[in-house]
């Protein structure tokens, strides 16, 4: 049978070097202007546009929010009541005014909502298109608006 190296002559190092050579990484960003304190904005088209411009057909895209009172999530885009229900539930879990909050800026609830929702999402790319379910979209989640915010996008692949 021979040992492993005879049967598989490509070393881990050479595989890693080939991977690095064919992997392309594109960094981009865009602004989002929010209109209310709590809001979900569909940013799927902006992300798809960045993927289109990157020329990457297969890989993934990281969508990142560099703010402590806003986040990124993937959820249903067909029924706006879903967004309403998400924001309502988060506001019930973390009310704006709660006895015991110690953060003195008045936005402790916003920090808590951000921690629960998260600040990033990873979406696969296949054939140059975001791999999302029929009803899914990527949403920017504002928890301390209205504000102008930044979204960072990194597209990786080939």
Question: Which residues does each PLM region occupy?
Answer:
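Active-site histidine-anchored catalytic micro-motif
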Residues: 17, 21-158
